[in-house]
Regions:
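Anion-binding alpha/beta catalytic cores of soluble intermediary-metabolism enzymes, centered on
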Residues: 1-194
Length: 194
């Protein structure tokens, strides 16, 4: 509701006088209207806010009025971690629970495209696993290696992609050095694929 939005803005010293507030009768209508605004080019991004995920996603994936593309829908957390020098995108920890290899290609490309939209100067994707070496007994390491080869061959574009990497050596230069990992992504990743 307008009054609540205005009160929160005032309480936090935020001037929203020049911003449009779109009122709707209920949460499902809010999701539908938000998706329509993006489709019409009047909004550039969707923010879930307090909507339930299923309400928002129902509007997003609706065939006639949603935001479907040729790729699978995926989720990205965009985080500003004060102790890390780069903004981080973490994908996909919310929508695709057990993605296939094809799904992972879409998830990675979606995150890369988001990073470019957010004007990351260089996109460095770390495909995470429990370890940073390829192990035939650990399927996620094999998939990570295959995804990197797909990036090498232009099937995933717009970023430097490396994996498998463990979380510590994906974001810590110290861990990268200790484990002697030669990688342009290790220790400097700004997209983490979980």
């Amino acid at each position: 509701p307008r009054a609540r939005i205005e009160a929160i803005a005032k309480e936090n010293g935020i001037d929203i006088a020049g911003l449009p507030i779109v009122e709707t009768p209920h949460s499902e209508a809010s999701a539908e209207k938000a998706v329509a605004l993006v489709r019409e080019g009047k909004a550039e991004a969707l923010m879930k806010g307090s909507l339930h995920t299923d309400e928002l996603m129902a509007a997003v994936v609706r065939r006639e009025t949603g935001l479907r593309t040729s790729r699978r829908v995926s989720h990205c957390f965009v985080m500003d971690v004060p102790s890390y020098e780069h903004t981080l995108i973490v994908t996909d920890a919310a929508v695709n629970i057990a993605p296939t290899m094809e799904d992972k290609v879409h998830i990675i490309q979606n995150a890369i495209d988001l990073a470019h939209a957010l004007r990351f100067p260089e996109v460095r994707v770390a495909i995470l696993s429990a370890m940073e070496t390829v192990n035939p007994k650990v399927p996620s390491t094999i998939e990570a290696a295959a995804l990197c080869k797909m990036a090498d061959r232009g099937q995933i574009t717009g970023a430097i992609v490396d994996g498998p990497l463990a979380l510590d050596n994906a974001i810590s230069l110290e861990s990268k050095a200790i484990k002697k990992i030669a990688s342009p992504v290790a220790g400097r990743a700004n997209v983490l694929v979980v």
